[in-house]
A protein has these predicted regions:
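Long, charged, low-complexity, helical-prone intrinsically disordered regions
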Residues: 2-476
Length: 476
């Protein structure tokens, strides 16, 4: 009967007898009922509690890590997530790595431990960037976007090779067979489409700064990791260059690895990765990730994980349905964020995140809060350049790129003052250049005095140091 799969041998009850047998179908029923009982024991936390939990889970703010090893761990957790290039260092890495320096990222890239890929251009010089651990890059890389290849594109491929068939890393001048400007344009088209990568992040920084070389700041000291001997720069060359290299094409370029074609292998890896990234994996979070096969594919894998005891399915966060998955230890940590569980937690704790940051649950695991006076022309979204300010897990403000338009979601004046203080701290830290608020909820900010609710928001900004200008309220 055991050979036929009708009986299962194991240790099912506490007893001296080592040999215990159970009918296979009865065991399945017991397992299902045990899992159901386990789910019923877990009281769901509020959505605000989850919004407090997620940034801390991703090491934002007080939970920040440090050093190059810490940055490597952050990249492991965020592997494959498209992030606006303009937000990568000041708004995503810096809040997670307390001593972050650009040299740390360049060290990981130069060592080959980490690679980066483009995931689409945005307006101007910005674009979406994803990072990958070298050992698992094939499992987190997206399939490159299809573009119409020109002779310049094909000439680059002739040197670099195609994805999965890289011929090595080459300097820009080794790629040039015609006009340098044409090759530069073609190279960046391949970068944003996800075909080509570089061994330094310097070209992306140069592109974001308009192609200028950083000339006024003293370069940071190399941030070598502990327990590692200093390594030589990969871009040192035996023969000096006679002409300066355009900073937007500096370093060496190579073809990216090919993405893993086996959907089952990718689904299993993605399920583990997303559990680690989100703590509690929900349908909304999975949909925002754009996983091939969607949540339906992940659900099958996660159900298998549950049966194997690798995770739990339950109703962990209220209002998000019963199809939620988490590791048991994660659920225990989530419950420490229950409303009122920690009376010593300071009220009005604010955190500013890039709207597209995976640590922002709104617009992904959680829906954007509704606004009674919603303006069709100003809606929140996980957009490049946009910011969200969360106070005690509640979305208080949504700011468009540069702060031009600010949407308020709170009637709590103290929460808004905390939000304004967090924005002011972001500017004073130098992580962003400045903020100019021109509109509040679609109304010119200089007319806020005529609207009591908007006046509270404007006053909070002024109290935080924003100055009145002919265009609006500015802080820099």
């Amino acid at each position: 009967m055991a050979l036929d799969g009708k009986l299962v041998r194991g240790e099912f009850v506490a007893a001296d007898d080592a040999d215990q047998w159970c009918d296979a179908e009865v065991l399945r029923i017991l397992r299902r009922r045990s899992l159901a009982a386990l789910r019923a024991q877990v009281e769901p936390v509020s959505t605000a509690a989850y919004a407090r939990f997620l940034p801390a889970w991703q090491q934002v703010g007080r939970s920040a890590t440090s050093g190059v090893d810490g940055l490597a761990g952050v990249i492991d957790q965020l592997a494959g997530v498209p992030i606006p290039a303009s937000a990568v260092e000041p708004l995503v890495f810096a809040p997670r790595v307390r001593d972050y320096q650009p040299a740390m990222l360049d060290e990981l890239l130069a060592s080959g431990e980490v690679t980066w890929s483009g995931a689409g251009s945005i307006s101007g010089s910005d674009g979406w960037i994803a990072f990958h651990h070298a050992d698992t890059a094939a499992l987190t890389l997206a399939t490159p976007a299809e573009i119409e290849f020109t002779d310049a594109h094909r000439a680059i491929f002739d040197v670099l090779g195609s994805p999965g068939e890289s011929r090595g890393a080459f300097f820009f001048r080794q790629l040039v067979q015609g006009s340098e400007e044409d090759v530069k344009t073609a190279l960046w088209e391949l970068i944003w489409a996800g075909w080509v990568t570089g061994d330094t992040f310097a070209p992306v920084r140069a592109m974001l700064s308009g192609g200028r070389k950083p000339g006024t700041r003293r370069p940071a000291a190399p941030a070598h990791r502990q327990r590692r001997a200093p390594r030589l720069s990969r871009y040192s060359v035996a023969h000096p260059q006679n002409r300066p290299v355009d900073p937007t094409v500096a370093g060496r370029w190579s073809a990216l690895p090919a993405a893993e074609p086996d959907s089952t292998v990718r689904a299993h890896f993605s399920a583990e990765l997303l559990l680690n990234r989100h703590g509690v994996l929900t349908k909304g979070a999975a949909a925002n990730e754009g996983v091939p096969g969607g949540f339906a594919m992940l659900y099958k894998v996660l159900s298998g994980f549950e049966e194997a005891g690798r995770c739990q399915r339950g109703y962990f966060v209220e209002s998000l349905g019963g199809a939620q998955f988490a590791v048991a230890s994660t659920v225990d940590r989530l419950r420490t964020y229950l409303d009122g569980v920690d009376p010593e937690r300071p009220d009005y704790q604010a955190v500013v995140l890039a709207a597209a940051d995976p640590a922002n649950p709104y617009g992904a695991a959680l829906p954007w809060p509704a606004r009674a006076d919603a303006d069709a022309g100003h809606r929140p979204g996980r957009k490049a350049g946009a910011l969200v300010v969360l106070v005690d897990g509640e979305l208080v403000w949504f700011s468009e790129r540069g702060g031009r338009s600010l949407l308020n979601f709170s009637t709590d004046g103290e929460a808004q003052r905390a939000a304004a203080g967090a924005l002011a701290e972001l500017v004073s830290s130098g992580r962003i250049g400045g903020i100019l608020v021109e509109k509040l909820d679609g109304v010119p900010v200089l007319e806020a005095a005529a609207h009591p609710d908007r006046k509270v928001t404007a006053d909070a900004l002024v109290d935080a140091g924003f100055a009145r200008t002919p265009r609006g309220l500015r802080l820099r």
